[in-house]
A protein has these predicted regions:
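Beta1-alpha1 glycine-rich phosphate/pyrophosphate-binding loop at the start
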Residues: 368-371, 377-378, 419-423, 458-526, ...
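Ferredoxin-like iron-sulfur electron-transfer modules
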Residues: 37, 67, 246-259, 275-304, ...
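A short, conserved structural fragment
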Residues: 80-91, 310-311, 856
């Protein structure tokens, strides 16, 4: 073990400032090991001579260490390069001056921001994280209100219309005050990335330096010079990407060297409050307030809030207490500071109040903000509504026609009369994407304002693959989609008949992906035509495998090899490719799901006079959408319930009929459904064709799955949150992971995979830190008090029907009119609203930038401001006394 170096110990004590006096320094102390492997004793002597936070000339320092200016010049250059000194030109003196700041904020940031130094001395990144963590743990309880070394400064647009705003609370004050600016990587994120602990918020072009700080950063290559206008652009882009602002808080009010664009999951300054409970030290003078009359619980503010102060709740009256007071252990009121700590603050973000929120948003697998887009549609703001929907679902026109509408199933209005026709409204909104003049194409949205260069391959152009593609392309990634089929869309194109999803509707939404820069390579089977290894060699950094479950499950009865027997998915694929599968005059479809409904209705359109659906359970257990069942019955399809195939009969190699057994319902199976059992009663039905639609399996084809593990069902195994497989650069999703589900499930999974891939392709990022788990819970409708007397009594609007298209391959359903949309949106009860926890709110104002409804604003509630670092010892002493008094008062009250 290397011997402890006294000069480095002494220097560490000096730089430690207020805490350096009492801190024990040994070889394991971050303030020691960050310098011990870098500084020489001669360099340490010069730094010691400089003292803390004093501007010194080279002549002064040379005299103090007994050397000439020429002798110490290279040592000064080294100290500046390391980040121990800040160098800037003193215009009055006409020469450079040297300034030694405290460790943090100060020296450690500058050390980390010297990229070459961080690469050659990775202990610097570790020291920054450890030092700031130790400092917060030891000093957090003693920091006076508003005296955090870093402090939140609100988004300036959030201050509009507020009286009593001080100049130093406005970002524009600093941009106007200084005349030189630079931008550097975020040092906190760079530190975390060096430790493999990044949160997906990248460090490039994040921290804006001003004045002498900018001069130093520019001269030492830590940052690039920018204009005032570019600084503002970076700040605004940070806000667009969900980042708030923090500033160095150790000078007099209105003085600062930098504006940081921070995230809660990486920033060491915010950690003082979010992990160690000292929120009063870091919060601004403002708190968020929600106007519940305007709030529609869209959740945009909630997902952005760095302090987790905003949660989705309800605004319907209830027999439950909807405002339970959290049992906080406040730092200012406890003698045991650790009780107020939250070591899991990067993992435990909650989106919803314990009492729940709007059932529609909760029930949707993608958590689409239904209440929000209904309100926008009611106001005629259709483009805004489309934009809001696409934050969670990039294919609303598709889903407006084929979704299984779990939002409507759970709609609170259904307890009064009928659920709101949510899907029909969505279809009306989304049809704006069918026209170039009205469609919504999102603009590039990432932290650097230009495309990333990391190439990503998506294998499978179905709903999961295209959803992942949309969100990656929106972030600026070059994405190539490979699909072995001749056209993109997967099951949306080839597994759903045109009378339910007309292909021009899907094509319009796929064309938006092309406009976003996505390349489709159809007719290319990965594994046969090109391998993943070859794609890696071409520079692809990540892969999303979403090939679906596109193989029909076998019936498992004799006669399946006969001509005239089809698998349901194979049959639909042929129909959608323009083929005419021979069904004859009599056709039986085996199964009871939505695929079976699509198949039987397609058979009717292909000329079958008698079409049967044979289902082994009763009508009550039929899993298909009731609307589709009704439409099939109206088209003449005959349903035979409690009927199971035993053998397919044939002659000369062709189907002639099917032998079936009458079933009865027995005891419930493991899923709670009553299991069908044979009765011994048999029947023969004369047929020309049999189509099995009892399920689908994954066909991995020639794709090399040796690096993946699969389940007994043949689906891929992967992490349930991140979708990462055993092969680190391969992620999976959609039906090839879950088994057959609905398009909206695949769409939701695709977005999560995009989040994972973004993190994966950038070194040093974790897949989970700071990630929103999106755990939703619905309000308890049993406790809701609905005052129905004042309700609009309009019944649910019904879509029109074009009889001329009946039994054709065109969609006979007619989209709502604008008048119908307005009437239907008025039926929404507006169940949800955002709730603010004023104790957790740090007053950043970021929430106000996300709200399209003018429902959330900042309010000034205090007037705290710090002085210079040199005043802190006195303020700390005052704070300790004040805290002791609070603890005593609380004890007396008890």
């Amino acid at each position: 073990m290397a011997q402890l170096r006294p000069k480095i110990v002494k220097l560490a004590k000096i730089i430690g400032g207020v805490t350096g006096i009492t801190t024990k320094i040994d070889e394991n102390a971050p303030e020691y090991y960050c310098m011990a492997g870098i500084l020489s004793d001669d360099e340490a002597d010069i730094a010691i001579a400089a003292g803390l936070r004093k501007e010194r000339t080279a002549g002064y320092l040379a005299k103090k260490v007994g050397k000439t200016v020429e002798e110490i010049a290279p040592l000064l250059d080294n100290l500046v390069y390391y980040g121990i000194f800040r160098r800037s030109m003193d215009k009055a003196l006409g020469e450079d001056v040297y300034y030694m700041q405290i460790f943090a904020p100060g020296i450690l940031e500058m050390m980390v921001n010297q990229k070459e130094l961080l690469e050659t001395h990775p202990e610097v990144g570790r020291a920054f994280e450890e030092y700031t963590r130790n400092l917060a743990a030891n000093m957090g309880a003693m920091i006076p209100d508003g005296y955090g070394l870093m402090r939140v400064i609100p988004v300036e647009s959030a201050l509009e219309g507020i009286e009593g705003v001080s100049d130093y609370e406005r970002i524009s004050h600093y941009l106007d005050k200084y005349d030189r600016f630079s931008v550097s990587p975020c040092s906190c994120r760079a530190s975390r990335s060096s430790l493999g602990d990044g949160c997906g918020h990248l460090e490039e072009d994040m921290c804006v330096q001003m004045g002498r700080g900018a001069e130093h950063y520019i001269r030492t290559g830590r940052a690039r010079e920018i204009t005032r206008e570019q600084a503002l652009e970076i700040i605004q882009r940070a806000e667009e990407n969900g980042l708030m602002h923090d500033m160095v808080n150790i000078e007099e009010p209105g003085e600062s060297a930098a504006i940081c664009n921070c995230c809660a999951c990486a920033c060491f300054g915010l950690r003082v409050g979010l992990m160690f409970g000292a929120r009063d030290a870091i919060r601004s003078n403002y708190v968020a307030e929600v106007d519940e009359a305007k709030c529609v619980a869209c959740g945009q503010c909630v997902e952005t809030c760095p302090g987790n102060a905003l949660k989705l709740g309800q605004k319907l009256c209830s027999t439950e207490d909807l405002t339970p007071q959290p049992d906080y252990v406040k730092l200012s009121e406890t003698i045991h500071p650790k009780r107020s700590w939250n070591p899991d603050y990067r993992e435990d973000h909650e989106d919803v109040m314990p009492t729940g929120t709007a059932p529609c948003k909760t029930a949707c697998p993608a958590h689409v903000p239904v209440q929000g887009y209904l309100k926008l549609a009611a106001q005629g703001r259709y483009t805004d509504a489309l934009e809001l929907i696409k934050k969670e679902n990039p294919f609303p026109a598709v889903c407006g026609r084929i979704c299984n509408k779990r939002c409507e199933t759970e709609c609170t209005r259904g307890a009064v009369d009928e659920a709101v026709a949510i899907d029909e409204v969505k279809r009306f909104i989304a049809d704006h994407d069918q026209h170039e003049a009205t469609r919504f194409v999102p603009k590039l949205c990432n932290q650097i304002g230009r495309p990333y260069t990391e190439k990503i391959a998506v294998i499978g152009a179905g709903p999961a693959g295209m959803s992942c593609t949309y969100y990656l392309a929106n972030k600026g990634y070059p994405v190539t989609v490979f699909d072995r089929n001749p056209v993109p869309g997967g099951m949306l194109t080839l597994g759903i008949p045109n009378f339910r999803l007309e292909k021009d509707v899907l094509t319009a939404e796929i064309d938006i992906l092309r406009e976003m820069g996505v390349e489709f390579r159809c007719g290319v089977e990965v594994g046969r035509d090109i391998t993943i290894e070859q794609l890696r060699a071409q520079g692809y950094k990540g892969f999303y495998v979403a090939i679906g479950a596109q193989k029909s499950a076998r019936l498992g009865v004799a006669g399946e090899e006969l001509t005239g027997v089809y698998g349901g998915v194979d049959f639909l694929r042929a129909v959608n490719l323009g083929e005419q599968p021979a069904v004859g005059k009599r056709c039986a479809v085996i199964g009871g799901g939505n695929v079976a409904m699509d198949v039987c209705r397609s058979a009717v359109r292909l000329g079958a006079d008698e079409t049967y659906v044979l289902y082994r359970r009763s009508e009550a257990e039929l899993p298909a959408d009731p609307e589709e069942v009704k439409e099939a019955m109206e088209e003449g399809v005959r349903f035979r319930f409690l009927t199971a195939p035993v053998e397919i009969l044939g002659a000369d190699g062709k189907v002639t009929g099917i032998r079936v057994e009458r079933m009865a319902l027995g005891e419930p199976d493991e899923k709670g459904r009553r299991k069908p059992v044979g009765t011994g009663e048999f029947e023969t039905i004369a047929l020309d064709s049999v189509i099995g639609a009892i399920g689908q399996t994954v066909d991995w084809g020639t794709l090399d799955t040796s690096a993946l593990t699969t389940t007994k069902r043949g689906t891929a195994e992967a992490d349930a949150l991140t979708y990462q497989t055993a092969q680190p650069d391969i992620f999976v999703g959609g039906d090839c992971y879950t088994g057959p589900k609905f398009a909206i499930d695949a769409i939701a999974a695709g977005k999560e995979a995009a989040i994972s891939l973004h993190r994966f392709v950038h070194p040093g990022q974790t897949l989970t830190a700071g990630r929103d788990r999106r755990v939703y819970r619905a309000l308890d409708k049993e406790h809701v008090l609905l005052e129905t007397a004042g309700f609009d009594k309009d019944h649910r609007q019904m879509p029109g029907y074009n009889a001329a298209k009946a039994k054709t391959f065109s969609d006979a359903r007619v989209t709502f009119t604008e008048e119908q949309v307005k009437k239907e949106c008025a039926r929404c009860l507006g169940c949800g609203a955002t709730k603010v926890d004023s104790y957790l709110c740090i007053g950043c104002g970021l929430c106000t930038t996300k709200c399209k409804f003018d429902a959330i604003h900042l309010k000034k509630v205090r007037d705290w401001h710090a002085g210079s670092y040199e005043t802190m010892p006195i303020k700390v002493a005052e704070g300790v006394v004040k805290r002791a008094g609070s603890i005593v008062k609380k004890a007396v009250r008890k």
